[in-house]
Every structure is written in structure tokens, then in C-alpha cells.
Amino acid sequence: MKITLIIPTYNAGSLWPNVLDAIKQQTIYPDKLIVIDSGSKDETVPLASDLKNISIFNIDSKDFNHGGTRNLAVAKTLDADVIIFLTQDAILADSDAIKNLVYYFSDPLIAAVCGRQLPHKDANPLAVHARNFNYSSKSIVKSKADIEKLGIKTVFMSNSFAAYRRSVFEELSGFPEHTILAEDMFMAAKMIQAGYKVAYCAEAVVRHSHNYTPREEFQRYFDTGVFHACSPWIQRDFGGAGGEGFRFVKSEIQFLLKNAPFWIPRALLTTFAKFLGYKLGKHWQSLPLSTCRYFSMYKSYWNNIQYSSSKEIK
């Protein structure tokens, strides 16, 4: 099994040396590593150059897209059986992270696997709870049969640390070329629809979290709303996340009451920001383009958007 590891980068910052060191320590080392950089001004590219089997490709930051840029990187490696994606701020937690992730491909019907994400050591209480809630200590393999029980969680996938079977990835035409985010969920949904299975491997662990402000959470959920407005078939076929959202808020309040009660007002403000951002994102076509760009975390996405581009992405 030939493995390629792909990392999109842009000014990777202080965590980057730790990310690279963790890759070097893997018991299964990738046959090829690709860093696709969007014009970093720091030491991102020079530091990556020391990795074994590394290829570095440069693109203009204005050309970056969560789907299209990853597709471009996949096209640079023609002989890989498995493609692993890692983000520049995700640190492999132990030397067997890649080994445990790719183990699932021994089942020919499993087309994608994502790993568990634990919070960084500097994570605030909201970030700690989010990772503990969303990333269980129990592994699971999901198929069409799980949709009734799991709903949209059936197609949960995160390219912060995820692997894809190359043959199925290409069979389904890769990620959408122009998407604001959630290219990983999009692909997992296509795989499930096509009769394949996707897995969550709790034994393949990375450290990855964000201490987002309420404003940043608003922006992130605005983008999530835009994604679902552009790809409504996912919620139509797999269900919404309403019930899961209520469970998250209840769990968060319980966690904070026990561990960090002074964070409850911040949590309530953040919850409102998420809700408002998502609702506005779902109706982005009713907003001026300048407002969409202002509300969005991924601002360059809006450079080539027109209101006539309401065609469903599928």
C-alpha cells in the first residue's frame, strides 16, 4: 500500500516544527509527502524541505480553495493507493497515528477514515469540550444502514486528519473544486451514497483545536451555512444537525458547570453567534456580496462568486 500525505500550508506558525517532528516519528512513514503552499512569508517552506520524500508546490493565495487545492495536490501523486490529508496545525499524537489510520483499508469497502482530535494543551474550556464531544473514544464504521440512526453524523469527516482510498476518490471525481469548506463531509456523503463505508478511528489521534472568539465562531458557522445552502442534498439525504446541536449545548453547560463555570456566559454568547451565523449563511443569496465577505472566515472564496451561481453543488 503506497501512502501519500498532503498538507496545505500558509504561514504555518509556531506549531509547524512540532507537526513536522511528529511526522518524522511515524512507524509507517509516507511514501510521498506533498506540501502545497499558498505563499507563506515565514519559515513554513524551508522547515518542510527537511522532510524525507517531500515535494513542495506553490500556488498564489488567491487561488486557494479547500476543495480545488487538495484536488491539485492529489493530481501530483499518481501512484498512491491511500491519500492522507493533514492540516498545518494538527500534531500527530503518537508514532502509530498513520499506522492506525490506514489499517481500516484492509476492508475493501471502506473508502475513507478520519482520526480522533484531542485539544491542544493551550485549549480553552470551550475548545476542550468541543473536541471531547465530537471525537469519541470509540471507533465506528458507518454505511447507508446507519443513516436512520446517526443522520448527518454518518458522513462526519475531517481533513484535519483523514485518509481516502485513491481509487474511490477518483471514481467519485474528488472534492468539489469550489467550496467554502466541508469538502471532507461532501466526499464522505458521496462515498456513502455510492455504497461504500467510512470509518472513524479513535486510535489514530492528532492534537488539533482552536480557541475561537465568538466573532470567529460566527464567521465559521456563516461559512457552514453557505456550504449547506450550496449543497442542500446532504441535509436532504442525511438529515440536519438540529438535535445534535441541542445535545452539544446541554453537554457544554454541564461540562462548564463542573469544570469552568465562569465560562458559561462566553459559551452562551458563542452559541448565539453560531446560530445567527449559520442562519445568515443559509440565506447568503439574500445578502449583499460585500456583507457575505465581511461575515465569512474564508474571504477569498467570494472573489469569484456571483448570485447566479446558485446551482446546487453535487
From Swiss-Prot:
Q: Which enzyme class?
A: transferase
- InterPro entries with a match to the protein in the record: Glyco_trans_2-like, Glycosyltransf_2, Nucleotide-diphossugar_trans
GO BP annotations of the record are: O antigen biosynthetic process; polysaccharide biosynthetic process; single-species biofilm formation
EC nos = 2.4.1.377
What pathway does this protein act in?
Bacterial outer membrane biogenesis; LPS O-antigen biosynthesis
Stored Pfam families? Glycos_transf_2
Q: Report if keyword Transferase is assigned.
A: yes
Q: Which Gene3D superfamilies match?
A: Spore Coat Polysaccharide Biosynthesis Protein SpsA, Chain A
- Function as written in the Swiss-Prot or TrEMBL entry: Rhamnosyltransferase involved in the biosynthesis of the repeat unit of the lipopolysaccharide (LPS) O-antigen region. Catalyzes the addition of a rhamnose to the galactosyl-undecaprenyl diphosphate intermediate.
Q: What is this protein called?
A: O-antigen chain rhamnosyltransferase RfbN
Q: Please name the SUPFAM superfamilies in this protein's record.
A: Nucleotide-diphospho-sugar transferases
